[in-house]
Amino acid sequence: MPEGPETRRMADGLSKAIKKKDLISYQFLHPNIDTLNDLKGIKVIDVSSLGKTIITRLNIGKSIMTHNQLYGKWSINLTTTVVKHNRKLRIEYKTSKKIARLWSATDIVLLETEKENTHHYIKNLGPDVLNNFVTIETIANQLESKKFRNRNLGGLLLNQNFIAGLGNYLRSEILFSSGLLPTTRPSDLDENQIYNLSNSIKVISMRAYQQKGNTIDKDDFSKRFGNIFNFRLIRHMVF
C-alpha cells in the first residue's frame, strides 16, 4: 500500500498534469461519482494529499477523495501513449498533452468541498506527517497524549488517527533509527527519547518523500561507503 510519501508524490504529479488545465474529456466510472459525467466544463482546481488519500478539488464545489489501498493505482501518460491495462478504469482526466487515470480503486468518495473536514475519515485523521505545519513538537504532543501514550509503538505507528501517512516501511525505519522495540510504549520513554522518536518520524518521512521512497541519509551513506554500494539500490536500513 502506498504510504504518505508515495501518495504526496503522486498528488504532485497529478497537480502538474491536470491542475487548472483545460480538460478535453473526463470520465467518472465509479458509482459514487458517475453523476459527474453529466456536467459540462469540469476543471481540476487543486490536488493535494492527506495521509494516504488524494483529494481532487473541482471547479463545481465538489471534491473527490480517493484511497488506493492495496490495489488502486494512478497513472499519468502522454495522450499519445498507448496504455495496455487489465485493471478497471475508475477516473480519467484528459488534457491536450496528458492523461491521468485512476485504476481499480474502490474507496472513492464525492464530497462538498466546503464540508471536506466534516467527513468522518478526514475528521478522525491525525496530523499529516508531511505537512509543513506539523512539527516535531506536534508529534511529541501526540505521543504524550492520554489517547496514545500507553499504546505499543508497533501498532501506534500504523494508526492513521495518531499520525497520518505512516505505514509499514516507515514504521520499520523509524523504530530502527530510534533504537526502540515495537512493544515499547510512549509512556516508557523519557523526554530525550520522545524527542528523538518524534524527530525520526518527521525526518524519515520527509526524506522518503524527497528521495522517492528512499529512507537512507544520502550524505551519511556517502561518508560511510563512498562508491562501494549504489545508493539507489539500497533504499532502506532495515525494511
Each model region followed by its residue ranges:
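Alpha-helical structural motif
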Residues: E3-E6, M10, K19, T118-Y121, ...
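Residue-identity detector for glycine
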Residues: G4, G13, G41, G51, ...
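Phosphate/anion-contacting hairpin/loop surfaces
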Residues: I64-G165, L170-S177
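Basic, nucleic-acid-binding surfaces and adjacent catalytic neighborhoods in DNA/RNA-processing proteins
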Residues: D22-T35, S48, Q142-F239
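Short clusters of hydrophobic/aromatic residues that line enzyme substrate/ligand-binding pockets
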Residues: L39, L125, L189
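A cross-family signal for N-terminal binding/gating loops and helix N-caps
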Residues: M1-W103, D107-L111
